[in-house]
């Protein structure tokens, strides 16, 4: 009888000990979400020791990776850079590479080396297997995006909106992405053309069309103003990481 009572008491102690263990584990699991609920600004400051950049009093962290927000920023830089290089060519008669060499005092060979190094760095960063190319939120939305010409070969130039991924006229972020991509391609090909021919973007355009700068001046002014306005216009719409903020 005494053995039975001691066995029951031991079993009760084991049950209470397990309950205490469960309580401790539950308490520990409740603390973890607080650690995971840090904002992006706090993570940026913890990782770098620096406050996140701020625009108009609103802080935002810098995220590496091929996200739409980063591509929008790079596209804006390309539009501003392309416009500034065209204005510089009108004033000096020199292309972007020659202007860069004039400002820095570097010769053509050194400038070409810097440009090639920059291109190589971006290519390596883009294809490096260990680099994080997409944030999880961007990956989750890939399946929800409408198919483009790379996903569906039936989409051709006969359907320009689907082919270029735009929704019509207007300063939306989707349209600005397209304009930014066009500016990046145009700027890149103008630099390649200048490295091959020694002529800037405007001189290359004159060679291709046979028109002088005087004939194309009005269209050029409209093009430059459009790029500058598109670069500084905030537009409408949101991206994934902005909606989750």
UniProtKB/Swiss-Prot annotation:
SUPFAM superfamilies: Chlorophyll a-b binding protein. Its main location: plastid. It comes from Chlamydomonas reinhardtii. GO terms for biological process: nonphotochemical quenching; photosynthesis. Induction: Induced transiently by high light stress (at protein level). GO terms for cellular component: chloroplast thylakoid membrane; photosystem II. This is Photosystem II protein PSBS1. Residues 1-25 form a transit peptide. The lineage of its organism: Eukaryota, Viridiplantae, Chlorophyta, core chlorophytes, Chlorophyceae. Required for non-photochemical quenching (NPQ), a mechanism that converts and dissipates the harmful excess absorbed light energy into heat and protect the photosynthetic apparatus from photo-oxidative damage. Seems involved in the activation of NPQ, possibly by promoting conformational changes required for activation of LHCSR3-dependent quenching in the antenna of photosystem II (PSII).
